[in-house]
Amino acid sequence: MHPNNKNSFKSKKKFIDRREAKSQDIKRALTHRARLRKNYFKLLEKEGLQEEGKPEDENDIRPTKKKGINFEERAAIVKQRKEEKRKFKLASVQAKLEKIESNSKERALKREQLKKSTTKGQPLMGPRINDLLDKIKKNEMS
């Protein structure tokens, strides 16, 4: 290839996008197949034979496809699901609040027991020892 030659690029192969080439091949194959089928059915008609794919009786019982649910039913289902979700959240929040409340009552009761003191102002050891024993039992269980 000489730089002075104007036709030097014409001799090179043209760039072919593989995707485009593949899609063109597929289209070509589909049209060819469709043409073959069309000619086949034309030949059958000329010979007076019925097409193989179609049943002889037009009144054959065909299974009816289930129709999709309409907008109102879908909206009702969505509304019901939202309501169930809301109730579930509400129940979980209620349970959480009850648990927090019971824990705070327990803490207040313990605090009152641990505050008890003798007439001279010394703290009572009985409730403190019981509290420590309860803590040890909880640690052993878990």
Curated annotation (Swiss-Prot):
GO terms for biological process: rRNA processing. The keyword rRNA processing applies. GO terms for cellular component: nucleolus. The keyword Transferase does not apply. Residues 99-115, 131-142 have a biased composition (Basic and acidic residues). Keywords: Coiled coil, Nucleus, rRNA processing. Residues 94-116 form a coiled coil. Residues 1-23, 47-67, 99-142 are annotated as: Disordered. It is found in: Nucleus, Nucleolus. Pfam families: rRNA_processing (PF08524). Its main location: nucleus. Belongs to the FYV7 family. Involved in the processing of the 20S pre-rRNA. This is rRNA-processing protein FYV7. It comes from Candida albicans (strain SC5314 / ATCC MYA-2876). The lineage of its organism: Eukaryota, Fungi, Dikarya, Ascomycota, Saccharomycotina. The gene is FYV7.
